[in-house]
Amino acid sequence: IFNLSQDAELINGTYGIYYKIQQIALFSCFRLSNTLISLLAFNIGLNNKDRIKECIKWGIIDTVIVAGIITIIFEVLAGPISKLFGLTTTGENKGQIITLCETSIRIASIGYVFMGISLAIQGILQAYRKALSPLLISTLRLIIFLVPVSLIFVRQSNVVNLVWWAFPIAEALTAVLSILILKFTEKIIAVKKEKQVI
């Protein structure tokens, strides 16, 4: 994505730092998603409809809350976090990279709440023993939405600041589709259960 001649080194250096920082948010949400899989799968096995609904509701809410807290922390501490993770950066662009990293954190972390929704729904779908739907959601987040949106921003003159908007946009679009996929999956499961009763 970042093959931009004069801005390439700056963006690649910044992305290298941002990627490490993003993992904090990503893995925090993954832990909740993995916990949700176990709890929800257990209640699906018991066919406890009330507990299933509660697990889904609170699984999504808890993941969004954690993602929201991380977003607030990153927005407030973007500067110190960038400097901390940028300690290993060398070269004449070090100051620019750290400044740009601060910008990238402030912009990209807006999408963490949407990422929390998507990751929680991936966990829910895995608990329902659906393997392809979570894979589709990951592909939407990381490739199908992110790459085209990034390519649009890459063509702009202020690419070093604009390209980071690709992350929250891709996360928001993925969250919307994740919700639709979950609703569709729940309808299919309900229809199958009705047929089994008949």
PLM-predicted stretches and their roles:
Residues 1-18, 24, 42, 82-92, ...:
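Helix-terminus/linker motif at the lipid-water interface of multi-pass membrane proteins
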Residues 8-11, 131-133, 159-160:
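Membrane-helix interface segments
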Residues 15-78, 115-137:
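Small-residue-rich hydrophobic transmembrane alpha-helices
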Residues 24-25, 76, 144-145, 164-165:
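Hydrophobic alpha-helical transmembrane segments of integral membrane proteins
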Residues 40-111, 153-198:
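Short alpha-helical transmembrane segments in multi-pass integral membrane proteins
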Residues 119, 145-154:
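Transmembrane alpha-helical segments of integral membrane proteins
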